[in-house]
A protein has these predicted regions:
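Acidic active-site catalytic centers that drive phospho-/nucleotidyl reactions
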Residues: 56, 79, 95-98, 102, ...
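A short, compositionally biased
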Residues: 39, 149-153, 254-255
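DPxDG-like acidic metal-binding loop motif
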Residues: 86-153
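Residue-level signal for inorganic ion chemistry
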Residues: 32, 56, 67, 100, ...
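An extended, acidic
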Residues: 163-281
């Protein structure tokens, strides 16, 4: 496949799902990086920090094309609009560039991510908040880090086993998180976020949920929480954290879903902190 002057690899349909996921995020990430080196401009989506570039679209188009060749019976769901209904009961969920604001401004903290999920809880068009996920792959091109894991394969970083999330209490570890500044003006989100944030030893806010979750899985970051995550921001990392021996949860507070990942103790404590605040009618 050629996108402008950038050529990406045609993948082998005989690859197993884990091999295919790894190849897709690696190729998509390298394609995006090459396009950035050639110069890009961002287009605003919902806010000044929520942007999209031609690289996002090109990387998603590449992944979609390869999946339609290699897994024609599977569904596809992408952040930038890709949507294909499948017949297999499985759907690939694509985030071609997670952390586009970072990507556009020259940071290395961005990635390409993909998950394969079961199509459970989708009757009558109703999609479950936290579907069952088969596998996830996350690739951070500028650091050449590839996390992979799923139901049938323990989590790895660049092919090597990882130690898994911290078993410590939140009070003794750092918590990675993200919240847009405007949400801090709304007590429905500000109060639970604050309750969880102050329970941690330290906070990290880097701007790429999938990069964060890969680091929770390998123990570099202690735990993670964020609200209102779409599937492409949640499922790749969820699969890898669970494949590393960690836990994940989704809790609802004031009509908002909060997504939590880490070791069992941290997930339990963060969930309790988030739900400890007053409930608004």
């Amino acid at each position: 496949m050629t996108t402008g002057r950038h050529t990406a690899t045609e993948l082998d349909p005989t690859l197993d799902d884990y091999q295919l996921a790894s190849a897709l995020v690696r190729e998509a990430g390298q394609l995006a990086l090459l396009m950035r080196m050639g110069g890009l401009e961002g287009e605003r989506k919902t806010s000044v920090s929520d942007v999209v570039t031609a690289a996002d679209h090109a990387a998603e188009a590449y992944v979609m094309e390869q999946l339609r060749r290699c897994r024609p019976e599977d569904g596809i769901l992408g952040e930038e609009g890709a949507s294909v209904s499948g017949t297999s009961g499985r759907t690939w969920v694509i985030d071609p560039v997670d952390g586009t604001y970072n990507f556009l401004h020259g940071s290395t903290y961005w990635c390409s991510a993909i998950a394969l999920k079961h199509d459970d809880g989708t009757d009558a068009g109703q999609r479950t908040v936290d579907p069952s996920v088969v596998l996830g792959a996350i690739y951070q091109p500028e650091l050449d880090k590839l996390w992979l894991g799923g139901q049938e394969r323990a989590a790895t970083l660049n092919g090597e086993p990882i130690s898994g999330p911290s078993a410590a209490s939140v009070a003794g570890i750092c918590a990675a998180t993200y919240i847009h500044p405007t949400w801090l003006a709304d007590p429905r989100t500000a109060m639970p976020w604050h309750a969880a944030a102050v329970s941690a030893a330290s906070l990290r806010m880097f701007g790429s949920g999938s990069c964060d979750l890969g680091r929770v899985a390998d123990g570099e970051l202690g735990c993670w929480f964020q609200h209102s995550c779409p599937e492409w921001d949640w499922l790749p990392g969820k699969a890898i954290v669970r494949a590393a021996g960690g836990e994940t949860a989704v809790v609802q507070v004031n009509g908002m879903n909060w997504f939590v990942a880490g070791g069992p103790t941290a997930v339990r404590e963060l969930s309790a902190a988030l739900t400890s605040v007053p409930q608004f009618a």
